[in-house]
Structure formats: C-alpha cells, structure tokens
Amino acid sequence: MRISKPHLRSISIQCYLCLLLKSHFLTEAGIHVFILGCFSAGLPKTEANWVNVISDLKKIEDLIQSMHIDATLYTESDVHPSCKVTAMKCFLLELQVISHESGDTDIHDTVENLIILANNILSSNGNITESGCKECEELEEKNIKEFLQSFVHIVQMFINTS
C-alpha cells in the first residue's frame, strides 16, 4: 500500500533552494538562512494534510455508492469546538467499521491512508486533553452518508482553526 505524503514534496523543494544558495553558506547570515530553512522543512503543513483527508473522504463516498452497506455509525453531528479532537478520534474509529463492512480493498486502503494522515496531524498538535466531551458510544447512530457529511464538517473545523 502506498501512503501519499504530499508534504514531503515541499521538503525536497526547500532542499533544492538550499543547494542553489550553497555559495552563501560561507557567511554567518548564510548559515542562519540554512538552519532556518532546515527547521521550516520539518514544520507540519496541516492545512494541506486536512485537504487530503477531505479528498480521501470524498473517495470513500464515491466508492460506497456502488455498494449497499447497511451500517449505522456513531456520529457527532453538532461538534463543540472544545471537543473536536475527541470527536475526530471517534470518527477515525468508526471509519474502521466502514472498512470492515465493505470488504473492499480500495476502501480499506483509502481508510488506512486517511487514518494515518489524520493521526499524524493530531499527533503534531501534541496530546490535547478535552474534558466534558461525549464518549463515542454516547453519540447518535446515523447512516454512512450522514456520517461522512459530519466527518467533512469536523475536518473543515480543523482547517478553519489552523
């Protein structure tokens, strides 16, 4: 399975820029530019990753159109901004149900990619603890279409606050 990591492309571009400027590394200012360039190459590009998560959700939605999956999933339809990480973790757990219920390798691969992308973004934000949020099992059960719509909504909340 190939995991798409578009943020690595920006790192290679920054490395090429460093090579173009290599003649200036002999000065103190050039060394500072080089060090700052290396730091910026490692910074997460969360907005781009969330866009890729939405893209994977759309792909899953397209793939399940041709199947009949009669599953209900725990869905947070009214996410409070202070509980968005907890809600995202519930959505990621429920995605595994879609993967299992479908039995389709394309859906499975897309779900795995989406989970990896989302977990990488969440881990780059540090361990955020939220209190007063609903547990996954306390959420309302909804069909897959409503689940995916709510999932896109919460991802957009992450994009708007990054």
From Swiss-Prot:
Source domain of life: Eukaryota
Disulphide-bonded residues: C83-C133, C90-C136
GO terms of biological process kind: immune response; interleukin-15-mediated signaling pathway; neutrophil activation; positive regulation of cytokine production; positive regulation of immune response; positive regulation of peptidyl-tyrosine phosphorylation; positive regulation of phagocytosis; positive regulation of T cell proliferation
Location of this chain's protein in the cell: Secreted
GO MF term (any one): cytokine activity
InterPro entries: 4_helix_cytokine-like_core (IPR009079), IL-15 (IPR020439), IL-15/IL-21_fam (IPR003443), IL-15_mml (IPR020466)
UniProt KW Lyase keyword: no
GO cellular component: extracellular space
Propeptide feature: residues: 30-48
Glycosylation positions in this chain: N127
Major subcellular site: secreted
Entry keyword set: Cytokine, Disulfide bond, Glycoprotein, Secreted, Signal
Pfam families registered for this protein in UniProt: IL15 (PF02372)
Signal sequence extent: 1-29
PANTHER family: INTERLEUKIN-15, INTERLEUKIN-15-RELATED
Family: Belongs to the IL-15/IL-21 family.
Function comment: Cytokine that plays a major role in the development of inflammatory and protective immune responses to microbial invaders and parasites by modulating immune cells of both the innate and adaptive immune systems. Stimulates the proliferation of natural killer cells, T-cells and B-cells and promotes the secretion of several cytokines. In monocytes, induces the production of IL8 and monocyte chemotactic protein 1/CCL2, two chemokines that attract neutrophils and monocytes respectively to sites of infection.
Name of the protein described by the UniProt record: Interleukin-15
